[in-house]
């Protein structure tokens, strides 16, 4: 249990600088119909194209700074670009365009014999609340499930909007997970 380990660490003089709680979620059946509802006019979901790299880099940069890096870490643009190129080369990715502008992305971040892990879900802040994240999640999940594997993802508990989207899609919580930074 994370709290027990943290207590033992504190007794040894090590104090956490940050604790981030996650939910480990799974989906093994088609996304629920209600999440596949209306999407904003002008929304297109598509595979990535080579000319998307700069737009996707902007999204990946924002995603890493907002969702990945702990509070005391500094952003490394070169590492982010390398990470994005690896995603584009190795993972499945879906791009969201709104009125011709790239505004969101969702990708796999790992795979096993039986599961895909979803990660890198990000919608530009000025486009949130329009149903883009929900639509990306529904379409991407449906495409991955059609390949015969279940889905897994980690979501920060404090990201209540994302938690709500995933639950609405049919993802269920398998376990709690914590990362503690010292």
Q: What is each model feature region?
A:
Residues 1-4, 152-168, 179-182:
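Conserved beta-strand-loop-alpha-helix junction that forms the acyl-donor binding cleft
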Residues 110-118, 128:
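A conserved beta-turn-beta hairpin within the catalytic core of GNAT-like acetyltransferases
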Residues 8-10, 166, 171:
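Conserved active-site tyrosine of GNAT-family acetyltransferases
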Residues 64-82:
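Conserved GNAT-fold acetyl-CoA-binding loop/helix
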Residues 120-125, 129-145, 164-168:
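Conserved acetyl-CoA-binding loop-helix of GNAT-fold acetyltransferases
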Residues 44-56:
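A short beta-loop-alpha structural element at the N-terminal edge
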Residues 1-40, 180:
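Acyl-donor-binding surface of acyltransferase catalytic domains
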Residues 81, 90-106:
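Conserved beta-hairpin
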